[in-house]
Amino acid sequence: MAARNWSRVWVGGTVILISFIAFSSQIFVIWPWYGREISLDLLMLLVPLNLAAFMIFWNYRLCVITSPGTVPEGWRPNIGAMDGMEVKKGTHTPRYCKNCAHYKPPRAHHCRQCKTCWLKLDHHCPWIGNCVGFYNQGHFIRFLLWVDIGTTFHLIIMVRRVLYIAEYYHEPTLADVLFLVFNFATCVPVWLCVGMFSIYHVYLACGNSTTIEGWEKDKVATLIRRGKIKEVKYPYNIGIYKNIKSVLGPNPLLWLWPQKMQGDGLSFPVNPSAGDHMTQYFWPPQDPSRLPNPPPIPAHASPFVYGNNGFNPNLRPTNSLRARRSSTPRIDEDEYSHEQGRHYSSGDERDNGSISASSSPEPYLSDYDHYDEGPMYPGERMTTLVPRVRRGSEGWEVAPGGGWNAYAGMMDEEVGWDDEAGYDEAPGEDPYVERPWEMRGRYNVYDPEEESGYTH
C-alpha cells in the first residue's frame, strides 16, 4: 500500500511539472509578450507547443496505464520441443519463478517492487509508477522523444523572449522575470536529464536490447575476456531498422504516433548469425565457476588452462607432460553427464542433447592480440614471439658469481659444511677436481662459473 501511494505521488508530481512548463510559459510569458491578441505569429508559437504538450500527456498516460505484459495464466513451455521457454543450462529445465509460481519466457524478469514477472522487462520507472516492458516500451520511448521535442521548442521561445527584452530595451515586469526564471530553472534540467535518458534508450532500441540485457551483455563480455566461457553473440540484434520496427512499429512515418505493440512477448526473432531459434533460450550464458555443481576437472587436465579446461594457445606442453598424457588413462567427461547440477554456459550440443563445456581457445581472444602457438603437432608452422614455459627442478638453486662466491666460501668454513656429507665421489673420480654442483645444507647448488673450468 505504501509503495502504491508513493507511486501516485511520483506520477502526480510528474504531471504537475509537465503542466507548469507547458502552460505557465504560455499564460505568463508568451501571451503578454504578444499583447494578448491573436495573431499569426502567436499561433506559430502556440500550436506546435500545445501539440507537443498533448503528445507528451498522451504517451505518458499510455506508459502509466499500459501493462508491460504478464505471463499468461496457465502458460507452460513445451519441454519436448523447447518452444517458448528459456531453459536453465545444464539441468535442461525451464526457468521458473518461485515468487510468482509460474514459468518464465525468454527475456522475462521478476520485478521486486511490482512483485510480478513482466515480459521483456527493461526497468522499473518511478516517474510513471510502472515497469517498462514489452507492451509499453514503445510508449515510453515516444514519451521521452516528445519531451525532448517539447522542451527544446520551449527553450527556444524563452531565449527569444530574453533576446527581445535585451534588444529593444523593454522593461520587463516582475511577473515576466519570475516566470522566465522559473521556466528556465525547471525546463533546462528536464531537457538535459531526459535528453540523455532518451539517447540511451534509443541506443538500446537500435540494438534491440533492454537495460537489464545491457548489464547482461557487459557481464558476458567480462566472462569471455577472462576466458570462462566461449564467445557468444547477442541473439536479438537483427539490424537497426528491424530492431526499431520491433519497438516503434512497422511504419517509420508513425514511429512517433502511439500504436499497439506487435507480437506476444513470449518468443522473439533471432539473428541467424547468432544461431537458430533455440539460441534465445540459452541467453545469457552463466559463469560456470558459480554453478551449484560445477563440472569436475578431468584427470588429464593441465595447470596451464585457458577457460573451460582448454589450453592457452600461447603455451606449449613439455615433453614430460606429453608423456604423462600418453600414459594416463583418459577420463571421459560423459561419465559425469548424469549429474543434475551441471550447468553448461555455452558450447556445442552433443548427440544426447547436453551441452559440451570444452571449447576451442580462439573465441576467447577477441579482446587480445593473438599469436600462433608453437608446433605442438607435426606440420604445424612456427612463428616468432612464442612464449615458453620454463619448468625448473625442485630443490636446485643457481649460485651467484663474483664476490658472492668468496663470501659463500667464508661462510662454509664458519658453518662447517662438510662436502663429504653432501657428495660421495664415484669410484675412480678425483676428489680434488672441482665440481659444478655440490650439496650445501639443504640445497643442491649449481655454480655456472665452475662448470666452465670443469674437465672430464
From Swiss-Prot:
Residues 285-298 have a biased composition (Pro residues). Signal peptide: none annotated. Disruption phenotype: Displays morphological changes and shows increases in adherence to and engulfment by host macrophages. Causes dramatic defects in cryptococcal morphology, stress tolerance, and virulence. Pfam families: DHHC (PF01529). Residues 309-321 have a biased composition (Polar residues). It comes from the Eukaryota. Residues 284-377 are annotated as: Disordered. It catalyses: L-cysteinyl-[protein] + hexadecanoyl-CoA = S-hexadecanoyl-L-cysteinyl-[protein] + CoA. Its EC number is 2.3.1.225. Belongs to the DHHC palmitoyltransferase family. PFA4 subfamily. HAMAP family: DHHC_PAT_PFA4. This is Palmitoyltransferase PFA4.
